């Protein structure tokens, strides 16, 4: 599975966890069915293990927004992206930013992709 697809599947699992208060294992199983992808699982597990710290990074960068007002898709995507940016050294920040924007265009809308870009641009230094 390519990393883009793994990110999309991770977003779907995180969305299910957020929306339905589903367990991590059940969400991964629902999304992956009989497939397995280590990177996808690493993303979901990493976000959930570091959720409080990730939210503490996101919140001050929301500019007149509150976490509870964000759509579940946008919140899940921001968490996923911040995890990649702050916790994974093998993914350049610009790649994570671009992937997040493109995924937002698919699962959210143009306005959300611009919002996500703005939030992540404040969080991620370009040079990593």
UniProtKB/Swiss-Prot annotation:
GO cellular component, one term: cytosol
SUPFAM superfamilies named among the record's database cross-references: NusB-like (SSF48013)
GO molecular function, one term: RNA binding
Keywords: RNA-binding, Transcription, Transcription antitermination, Transcription regulation
Pfam family, one: NusB
Gene Ontology biological process: DNA-templated transcription termination; transcription antitermination
Keyword Transcription listed: yes
Domain of life: Bacteria
Its biological purpose: Involved in transcription antitermination. Required for transcription of ribosomal RNA (rRNA) genes. Binds specifically to the boxA antiterminator sequence of the ribosomal RNA (rrn) operons.
Family from the record: Belongs to the NusB family.
NCBIfam families per the UniProt record, alphabetical: nusB, PRK00202.1-1
Protein name: Transcription antitermination protein NusB
């Amino acid at each position: 599975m390519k990393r883009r697809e793994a990110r999309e599947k991770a977003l779907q699992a995180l969305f299910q966890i957020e929306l339905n208060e589903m367990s991590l294992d059940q969400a991964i199983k629902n999304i992956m069915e009989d497939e397995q992808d280590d990177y996808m699982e690493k993303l979901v597990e990493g976000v959930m293990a570091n959720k409080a710290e990730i939210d503490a990074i996101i919140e001050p960068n929301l500019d007149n927004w509150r976490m509870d007002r964000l759509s579940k898709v946008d919140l899940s995507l921001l968490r996923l992206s911040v995890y990649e940016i702050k916790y994974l050294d093998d993914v350049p920040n610009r790649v994570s930013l671009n992937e997040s924007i493109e995924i937002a265009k698919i699962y959210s809308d143009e306005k959300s992709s611009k919002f996500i870009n703005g939030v992540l641009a404040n969080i991620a230094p370009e040079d990593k």
